[in-house]
Amino acid sequence: MDSLIKLFFCLFIFLCTSLLFGEINGVEGSNQNHHLYPFRPTKLFVFGDSYADTGNIKKAFSSSWKFPYGITFPGKPAGRFSDGRVATDFLAKFVGIKSPIPYFWKDYAGKKRLQYGMNFAYGGTGVFNTQTPLPNMTTQIDIFQNILTTGDIYYPPELTSSVALVSVAGNDYSNFIALNRPASEFPAFIKQVVDQTEVNLRRIHALGVKKIAVPSLQPLGCLPPFTFVTSFQRCNETQNALVNLHNNLLQQVVAKLNNETKQSTFIILDLYNAFLTVFKNKGSNPGSTRFESPLKPCCVGVSREYNCGSVDEKGVKKYIVCDNPKTAFFWDGLHPTEEGWRSVYSVLRESLTASLIKA
């Protein structure tokens, strides 16, 4: 078990590091989806990692600013870890607002653009510090709190109609292995991550945010590096079993918090089962593109030492992109395509309506 965990997360570390730093710009989300229910969110505040980051890392330090990232939307690299829109954009679209501006770009946005909230997520970061030297979630929330304290942009009464997305996609666990900590300590560390997530959720709520959505950990055993050995046909169930402890503890935390508030303030976005549902159905939904090989990534390096977006010293590209990103669930070794995220949020739509809008 010790060697299995180390193999899994060493690969995960390699992928995170190479994709993030060998690899940000707000999106205008659709202003559709007008729900005639009691709670109508008008702002979205985002915290977390590359599944939610829409442009906070400086261009010189992130491959998300390199071609071919962004080829589907907006047609050029724009700081997202995908070919197009990511989780933040689809949640914003669901609640009927424009995608919130990244914190890094706030000084370049007009007041009207800031009214939809702000994105504090940084790719590669975790609940605790990771190998990525960028603000962890505690610091991201500190930044949010400072903005509220100054009162220049947002005022407390405005937060009563706000939603927060809190993305925890596993970077803490890859960092755990990078530090060569013994696998016997791994279960206790998972509890530390979830306990700190609880602290973070409480802080965000105490600052006045009305509803807080936290995704479950996605099935890490279904990431392309770990399905490669089966020609992208099967997920590694042993690795996915390691994810269940995190998700079970997270469910307990959210249930406790909701019991304390006597409301459905905290919501779990079940990414784990949403991903598996898309894989099982191959993305088959009315009006959507079918994923013939949902576990196979669209953009890959030409050999092991290269990744999506890699170029050599002469600027010659060292990656291959599939003919149509809309037919792929995964964009690179870690991140879904825009179409992948669209399919995930299609699966989540019913539960989101019940827990986020109607509740």
From Swiss-Prot:
Subcellular location: Secreted
GO biological process, one term: lipid catabolic process
UniProt keyword annotations, A-Z: Glycoprotein, Hydrolase, Lipid degradation, Lipid metabolism, Secreted, Signal
Glycan attachment residues as annotated in the record: 136, 236, 259
InterPro entries noted in UniProt: GDSL, SGNH_hydro_sf, SGNH_plant_lipase-like
Signal peptide (from-to): 1-22
EC number, UniProt record: 3.1.1.-
GO cellular component: extracellular region
Major localisation: secreted
Active-site residue numbers: 50, 332, 335
Top-level lineage group: Eukaryota
SUPFAM superfamilies in the cross-refs: SGNH hydrolase (SSF52266)
GO MF annotation list: hydrolase activity, acting on ester bonds
The family this protein is said to belong to: Belongs to the 'GDSL' lipolytic enzyme family.
Protein's name according to its UniProt entry: GDSL esterase/lipase At5g03610
Organism: Arabidopsis thaliana
